[in-house]
């Protein structure tokens, strides 16, 4: 464990908590893409199948349980509990264009042609594009609530910190995983536009508005 | 080939 990975995990966890609290407290999922949350639930499910078979540490297991539980809770709130506030008309990204290519790619490019490894690879590829429906929705509605932009910032920063974690691990642990690194780079690049707006607008107290 | 060491990341 290194500081970048730890801060990355904390950032990821806080993004998940921010979103849960936003929906639960405001009893509304307005402006939130249910499709992205569905994709995240798939990402965690396919990545943590070894949750019960491969014990790494208490920290690792507990974080995985929290991620999986909270992602399902978020999906449940959006599509069930508060579905009346779900803005389906603006959440129109075709997720099959994300799931099918990443699934095919995980069969073609992976470290090991075994079910667990292919599912892990699929989850890595899917996670790198899972935020697209949410970013698409923000661009369609033309703006996002401030709390939603904090959620997106924390979520984007987590994988950016993981990039530093991989530099660190390459340097000091001779550890190197090209699949995770390339997907992490793609994921971070997708946030660049949002990072720019967040830093130039939200941090100055303005509302986040994308050029529609 | 990456060993199982990798699976220590979330």
Curated annotation (Swiss-Prot), chain A:
<comment type="function">
    <text>Receptor for the C-terminal sequence motif K-D-E-L that is present on endoplasmic reticulum resident proteins and that mediates their recycling from the Golgi back to the endoplasmic reticulum.</text>
</comment>
<feature type="topological domain" description="Cytoplasmic">
    <location>
        <begin position="80"/>
        <end position="92"/>
    </location>
</feature>
<dbReference type="GO" id="GO:0005783">
    <property type="term" value="C:endoplasmic reticulum"/>
</dbReference>
<dbReference type="GO" id="GO:0005789">
    <property type="term" value="C:endoplasmic reticulum membrane"/>
</dbReference>
<feature type="transmembrane region" description="Helical">
    <location>
        <begin position="93"/>
        <end position="110"/>
    </location>
</feature>
<protein>
    <recommendedName>
        <fullName>ER lumen protein-retaining receptor 1-B</fullName>
    </recommendedName>
</protein>
<feature type="transmembrane region" description="Helical">
    <location>
        <begin position="33"/>
        <end position="52"/>
    </location>
</feature>
<comment type="similarity">
    <text>Belongs to the ERD2 family.</text>
</comment>
<dbReference type="Pfam" id="PF00810">
    <property type="entry name" value="ER_lumen_recept"/>
</dbReference>
<keyword id="KW-0675">Receptor</keyword>
<keyword id="KW-0812">Transmembrane</keyword>
<feature type="transmembrane region" description="Helical">
    <location>
        <begin position="179"/>
        <end position="199"/>
    </location>
</feature>
<dbReference type="GO" id="GO:0005801">
    <property type="term" value="C:cis-Golgi network"/>
</dbReference>
<dbReference type="GO" id="GO:0006890">
    <property type="term" value="P:retrograde vesicle-mediated transport, Golgi to endoplasmic reticulum"/>
</dbReference>
<feature type="transmembrane region" description="Helical">
    <location>
        <begin position="59"/>
        <end position="79"/>
    </location>
</feature>
<keyword id="KW-0931">ER-Golgi transport</keyword>
<keyword id="KW-1133">Transmembrane helix</keyword>
<feature type="topological domain" description="Cytoplasmic">
    <location>
        <begin position="200"/>
        <end position="212"/>
    </location>
</feature>
<dbReference type="GO" id="GO:0046923">
    <property type="term" value="F:ER retention sequence binding"/>
</dbReference>
<feature type="topological domain" description="Cytoplasmic">
    <location>
        <begin position="136"/>
        <end position="149"/>
    </location>
</feature>
<feature type="topological domain" description="Lumenal">
    <location>
        <begin position="169"/>
        <end position="178"/>
    </location>
</feature>
<feature type="transmembrane region" description="Helical">
    <location>
        <begin position="117"/>
        <end position="135"/>
    </location>
</feature>
<feature type="region of interest" description="Interaction with the K-D-E-L motif on target proteins">
    <location>
        <begin position="47"/>
        <end position="48"/>
    </location>
</feature>
<dbReference type="GO" id="GO:0033116">
    <property type="term" value="C:endoplasmic reticulum-Golgi intermediate compartment membrane"/>
</dbReference>
<dbReference type="InterPro" id="IPR000133">
    <property type="entry name" value="ER_ret_rcpt"/>
</dbReference>
<feature type="site" description="Interaction with the K-D-E-L motif on target proteins">
    <location>
        <position position="117"/>
    </location>
</feature>
<dbReference type="GO" id="GO:0005046">
    <property type="term" value="F:KDEL sequence binding"/>
</dbReference>
<keyword id="KW-0813">Transport</keyword>
<feature type="topological domain" description="Lumenal">
    <location>
        <begin position="1"/>
        <end position="4"/>
    </location>
</feature>
<feature type="region of interest" description="Interaction with the K-D-E-L motif on target proteins">
    <location>
        <begin position="159"/>
        <end position="169"/>
    </location>
</feature>
<feature type="region of interest" description="Important for recycling of cargo proteins with the sequence motif K-D-E-L from the Golgi to the endoplasmic reticulum">
    <location>
        <begin position="204"/>
        <end position="207"/>
    </location>
</feature>
<feature type="transmembrane region" description="Helical">
    <location>
        <begin position="5"/>
        <end position="24"/>
    </location>
</feature>
<feature type="transmembrane region" description="Helical">
    <location>
        <begin position="150"/>
        <end position="168"/>
    </location>
</feature>
<feature type="topological domain" description="Cytoplasmic">
    <location>
        <begin position="25"/>
        <end position="32"/>
    </location>
</feature>
<keyword id="KW-0968">Cytoplasmic vesicle</keyword>
<keyword id="KW-0472">Membrane</keyword>
<dbReference type="GO" id="GO:0015031">
    <property type="term" value="P:protein transport"/>
</dbReference>
<keyword id="KW-0333">Golgi apparatus</keyword>
<dbReference type="GO" id="GO:0030663">
    <property type="term" value="C:COPI-coated vesicle membrane"/>
</dbReference>
<dbReference type="GO" id="GO:0006621">
    <property type="term" value="P:protein retention in ER lumen"/>
</dbReference>
<feature type="topological domain" description="Lumenal">
    <location>
        <begin position="111"/>
        <end position="116"/>
    </location>
</feature>
<dbReference type="GO" id="GO:0000139">
    <property type="term" value="C:Golgi membrane"/>
</dbReference>
């Amino acid at each position: 464990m290194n500081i970048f990975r730890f801060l990355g995990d904390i950032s990821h966890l806080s993004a998940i908590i921010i979103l849960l609290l936003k929906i639960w407290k405001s009893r509304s999922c307005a402006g939130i893409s249910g499709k992205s949350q569905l994709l995240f639930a798939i990402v965690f499910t396919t990545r943590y199948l070894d949750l019960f078979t491969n014990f790494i540490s208490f920290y690792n297991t507990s974080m995985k349980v929290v991620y999986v539980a909270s992602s399902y809770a978020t999906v449940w709130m959006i599509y069930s509990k508060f579905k009346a506030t779900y803005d389906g008309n603006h959440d129109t990204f075709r997720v099959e264009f994300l799931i099918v290519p990443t699934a095919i790619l995980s069969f073609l490019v992976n470290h090991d042609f075994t079910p667990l490894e292919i599912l892990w690879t699929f989850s890595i590829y899917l996670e790198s594009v899972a935020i697209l429906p949410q970013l698409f929705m923000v661009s369609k509605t033309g703006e996002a609530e401030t709390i939603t932009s904090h959620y997106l910032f924390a979520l984007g920063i987590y994988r950016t910190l993981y990039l530093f974690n991989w530099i660190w691990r390459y340097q000091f642990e001779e550890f190197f995983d090209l699949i995770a690194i390339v997907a992490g780079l793609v994921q971070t690049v997708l946030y660049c536009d949002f990072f720019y707006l967040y830093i130039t607008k939200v941090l100055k107290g303005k509302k986040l508005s994308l050029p529609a | 080939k990456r060993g199982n060491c990798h699976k220590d990341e979330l």
